[in-house]
């Protein structure tokens, strides 16, 4: 029903009788935190929903049915009295509605897109409402969406829905509401069938936490963004001139075709081919080339991406309000977008030609090898030191604020005035969860050790080496590679590439590892056997993974990553509850790290308490959480030291009165 000024009172009287509303907003853009607003609100009540569209900001020149501002205020007052709000990607709608007066904090939130993720097979990748409707009810069911969007594009209304008449947008929005309710009912039945009710309840609480994190946002130092981008441009100019001088002519370094032609002029051929059989000049191919020009090309491209992706978009931003998706990954791990904080480089970047030490070169070789093997390639062990030096511009996580030739993307993110960013980082979380799945007396002792080096312990158990032995470092790295290879489902071929050994040697080392780490092989084989026989498996929280039988080897990854993710969610919920009556808040969760913005007056008291809350978990797995202060930005970390609140006194005799 398209609500008009004449039918508004009747519509409001009807919907206010229901404690649960399904909502969908139409907007003139996506930036709820900035310039954009709703142009209309879709509401559905009842399990066989009666739907309404309340138009408020459609252009009057196109449509004269807009309701009046006091009626929007009245609708928000009525919505504030309902107890439960349902939506598809509901946080998006709620941010816009809160800008109009909705009070979110006391509501039960049900995000249907999370329900869809919990009840879909692992090979499903598309979770938009349209894609889900097609997949669930067939192509015809989604025809309303396809035809409406086609009309919106044709009339150039697509980027700003307020330009579209309410008579077109209203029925479209109501249909979205109808299908959101239908999907909720159908998938709720499937959720109960698969006994994932507790998992969904966890996700419901997490939705509140993520909503508050998105709303607060993280401040950005846009002056640093401009400064760092300027430094990169200068460095790119140096590299570009060096490349052109070597090749003998100018060309577009970001063009794979022109790069290929330039390298061929130097007698360099690609050893990597595309699917169509053409020469490839991506990172994997450049890593095979024993010539400095290849390293400089990679350096130029990387710096170009840093500048365009992570610096220039923030020139005019004061804060970032990313979208956290608790439906974005199969395992249950959070993903984020606009921007994707999970992809922010942790390392700093060196904009200079400082020669590397032999130890540094070994580290660089390891990084290149890992990057190449991740794409199924083989690392060229014969790269000269001169070439390796050109690949050494990527540093580690120890960013030096005073070093003019260093930049860090994490340096962009700073605390508000009177606050401190504090990092709570789980130490070797996935390894701990992995070990807990086949916990025995030996593993139990290992898990309960303080400051334990699991990879070193695994090397001792599997290969009989001890710290201080000449080959300890080599076997520790091997144990680490096999541990994560098992968790991520890496086969012997890929493991061999990472270790720089043959496929057979990698297989032999893996067998030795399994033999030394008692219970690990039985666990791995049981997971593969269970998935192969029934096509699904559940993690320790009861989260279901529907896995194609030919991907059974990925089962361990789903269990370990999924359990780690659910522990993080559980603990974030507890920290969020703890902070409700305080000034401090959770800002960001990336991988196994949680960043909180803690008010300086609370820093001493609540930081240790947050650490304790994060270390606890309902599974009883011994976890360690490292605490560091990020000052003056996320890029620079130091051990947590309590701030002294005592006034500083100076003895009178120590003052120079002259």
Q: How would you label these PLM feature ranges?
A:
Residues 48-85, 218:
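Nucleic-acid-processing active sites and adjacent nucleic-acid-binding tracks
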Residues 1-54, 134-137, 141-405, 414, ...:
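Conserved "right-hand" nucleotidyltransferase catalytic core of DNA-directed polymerases
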Residues 22, 83-93, 421-423:
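Acidic beta-strand-to-loop metal/phosphate-binding motif
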Residues 215, 320-322, 326-329, 462-589, ...:
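Conserved catalytic core of nucleic-acid polymerases
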Residues 606-614:
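Short amphipathic alpha-helices in soluble, non-transmembrane regions
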Residues 103-121, 129-130, 451-457:
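Conserved beta-strand -> loop -> alpha-helix junction used to position metal-binding or nucleic-acid-contacting
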Residues 498, 595-599:
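Short hydrophobic/aromatic beta-strand micro-patches
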Residues 30-31, 91-103, 115-120, 260-267, ...:
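Short active-site loop/helix that positions an aromatic residue
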């Amino acid at each position: 029903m398209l609500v008009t000024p004449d039918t508004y009172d009747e519509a409001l009287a009807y919907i206010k009788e229901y404690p649960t509303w399904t909502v969908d907003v139409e907007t003139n853009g996506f930036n709820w935190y900035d310039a954009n607003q709703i142009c209309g609100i879709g509401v559905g009540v009842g399990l066989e929903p009666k739907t309404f569209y309340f138009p408020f900001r459609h252009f009057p020149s196109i449509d004269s049915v807009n309701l009046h501002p006091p009626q929007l205020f009245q609708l928000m007052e009525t919505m504030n009295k309902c107890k439960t709000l349902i939506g598809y990607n509901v946080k998006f709608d709620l941010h816009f509605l809160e800008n109009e007066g909705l009070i979110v904090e006391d509501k039960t939130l049900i995000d249907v897109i999370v329900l869809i993720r919990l009840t879909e097979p692992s090979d499903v990748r598309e979770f938009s409402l349209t894609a889900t409707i097609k997949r669930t009810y067939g192509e015809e069911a989604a025809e309303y969406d396809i035809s409406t969007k086609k009309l919106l594009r044709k009339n150039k209304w697509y980027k700003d829905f307020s330009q579209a008449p309410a008579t077109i947008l209203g029925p479209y929005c109501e249909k979205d509401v109808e299908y959101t309710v239908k999907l909720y009912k159908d998938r709720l039945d499937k959720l109960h069938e698969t006994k994932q009710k507790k998992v969904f309840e966890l996700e419901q609480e997490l939705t509140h936490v993520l909503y508050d994190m998105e709303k607060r946002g993280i401040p950005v130092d846009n002056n640093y963004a401009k400064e760092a981008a300027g430094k990169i441009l200068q460095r790119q100019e140096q590299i570009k001139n060096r490349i052109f001088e070597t090749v003998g002519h100018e060309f577009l370094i970001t063009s794979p075709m022109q790069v290929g032609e330039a390298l061929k002029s130097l007698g360099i051929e690609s050893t990597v081919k595309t699917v169509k059989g053409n020469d490839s000049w991506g990172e994997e191919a450049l890593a095979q080339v024993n010539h400095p020009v290849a390293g400089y090309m990679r350096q130029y491209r990387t710096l170009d991406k840093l500048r365009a992706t992570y610096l220039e978009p923030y020139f005019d931003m004061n804060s970032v309000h990313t979208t956290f998706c608790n439906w974005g990954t199969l395992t249950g791990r959070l993903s984020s977008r606009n921007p994707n904080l999970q992809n922010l480089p942790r390392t700093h970047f060196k904009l200079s030609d400082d020669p590397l030490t032999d130890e540094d070169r070994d580290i660089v070789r390891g990084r290149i090898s890992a990057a190449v093997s991740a794409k199924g390639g083989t690392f060229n062990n014969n790269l000269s030191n001169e070439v390796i030096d050109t690949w050494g511009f990527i540093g580690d996580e120890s960013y030096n604020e005073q070093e003019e030739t260093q930049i860090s993307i994490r340096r962009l993110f700073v605390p508000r005035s009177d606050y401190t960013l504090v990092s709570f980082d789980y130490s070797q979380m996935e390894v701990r969860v992995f070990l807990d799945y086949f916990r025995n007396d030996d593993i139990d002792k290992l898990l309960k050790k303080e400051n334990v080096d699991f990879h070193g312990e695994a090397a001792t158990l599997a290969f009989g080496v001890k710290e201080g032995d000449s080959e300890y470092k080599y076997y520790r790295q091997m144990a680490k590679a096999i541990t994560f290879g098992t968790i991520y489902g890496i086969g012997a071929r890929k493991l061999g590439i990472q270790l720089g050994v043959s496929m057979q040697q990698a297989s032999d080392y893996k067998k030795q590892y399994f033999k030394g780490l008692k219970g690990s092989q039985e666990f791995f084989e049981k997971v593969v056997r269970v998935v192969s026989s029934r096509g699904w498996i559940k993690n320790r929280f009861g989260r279901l993974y529907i896995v194609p039988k030919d991907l059974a080897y990925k089962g361990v990854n789903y269990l370990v990553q999924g359990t780690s993710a659910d522990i993080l969610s559980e603990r974030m919920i507890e920290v969020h509850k703890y902070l409700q009556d305080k000034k401090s808040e959770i800002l960001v969760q990336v991988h196994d790290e949680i960043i909180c913005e803690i008010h300086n007056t609370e820093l001493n008291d609540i930081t240790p308490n947050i650490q304790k809350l994060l270390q606890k978990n309902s599974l009883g797995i011994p976890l360690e959480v490292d605490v560091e202060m990020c000052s003056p930005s996320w890029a620079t970390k130091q051990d947590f030291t309590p701030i002294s609140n005592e006034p500083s006194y100076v003895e009178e005799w120590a003052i120079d009165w002259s």
